[in-house]
Curated annotation (Swiss-Prot):
Entry's family note: Belongs to the Casparian strip membrane proteins (CASP) family.
Residue ranges crossing the lipid bilayer per the database entry: 18-38, 43-63, 78-98, 130-150
Gene Ontology cellular component list: membrane; plasma membrane
Keywords of the record: Cell membrane, Glycoprotein, Membrane, Transmembrane, Transmembrane helix
Name recorded for this polypeptide: CASP-like protein 5B3
InterPro entries in the cross-refs: CASP_dom, CASPL-5
Annotated localization: Cell membrane
Extracellular domain ranges by topology: 39-42, 99-129
Domain of life, per lineage: Eukaryota
Cytoplasmic topology ranges: 1-17, 64-77, 151-154
Membrane topology: Multi-pass membrane protein
Organism from which the protein derives: Oryza sativa subsp. japonica (Rice)
Glycosylation: residue positions: 39
Amino acid sequence: MKDVVGSPGTWSGMSLRVSQCVFAGASVVAMASAYGFSNYTAFCYLIASMGLQLLWSFGLACLDIYSLQTKRDLHNPVLVSLFVVGDWVTAILSFAAASASAGVTILFERDVHFCRMYPQLSCGRYELSVILAFITWSFIATSAVSMFWLLASL
């Protein structure tokens, strides 16, 4: 049962990793280009978490590309265990960062109306970055579950 969708060294695995990279990078760019993001810890945590996710996913995407070119099998139990731990750690960090940033964004938009009182705040970019972070997390969660499934089948 080594034919798990999203497993390392497959086209589906590579597409998951590339999607994670693209959306994590877009989330970082959206937040970093927003005025005043550095004044709020949750937004800084989101950038740090998405930056870590970008590096992790980029490294594994490169490994998938190498594996596809050389026809190497990456279904080694030790290697898959490393992928499982890395995916679950980054998934938890990304979900926590996205949730914290969503909480601050909702607070600004709906509860204290900071966005109306301080129009220089880039609330639209905060929202966009949070949405992209949740999309990134959905790809990470898919990858983490498929890695766990693959590890159980080895």
